[in-house]
């Protein structure tokens, strides 16, 4: 997701060459408010409350299989959301959902076409959004060989790589608010976590309220992005290091984000 057309010199070097094609990002805040961020202007182009949902939206993501934006609410109801109007249409009702009051991670596995739901309490679910069937996978825990072995995970965001239709392989990365770092969850179904590295966010930013997504070009290239406060950061998937890229006007309290499919196969 090389998404900004104009950056500081250091950020431009980091993010690489830009193209003429902007990308839109859906950013979730409050209970069910979506802001559409235009990556060309670096501003919010429209903001609306999701129309037709009952309850707090846990998280959002684009499903690679159909390129539609999905939202999951607290009672487990799954909706598709029209990004032009904000109108929600019920898709299914999950037979099990996350523990009330926990921070939620919602992201589609592009290979299995299943929705991963993770709670900050360690609950780890895998859902078929077509029929609502849910598999309870292994509770999150750090690997026996990890430096954080025995500690309680506090995952507040996560995303899969290669998030495109027809992907043959993928990997799941999480953000842990307690250690302020990037984790790799492998295998995702087992819930086994391995620390990649510290994000190194500014101390003024609240790592408990962040949004995280990974852009993929369909050719094996992945770029991870994290929103904290009103700053978008690039995240190195090899080291966990988060680097401020640009400040976004008109957003605050963003707790989930989804990179929307654009007219071109590849954003900037």
Predicted regions and their residues:
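Structural signature of eukaryotic scaffold interfaces centered on beta-propeller domains
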Residues: 58-67, 97-113, 150-168, 205-220, ...
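A short beta-strand motif characteristic of beta-propeller blades
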Residues: 43-52, 87-97, 136-148, 192-204, ...
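Gram-negative bacterial Sec-dependent N-terminal signal peptides
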Residues: 1-22
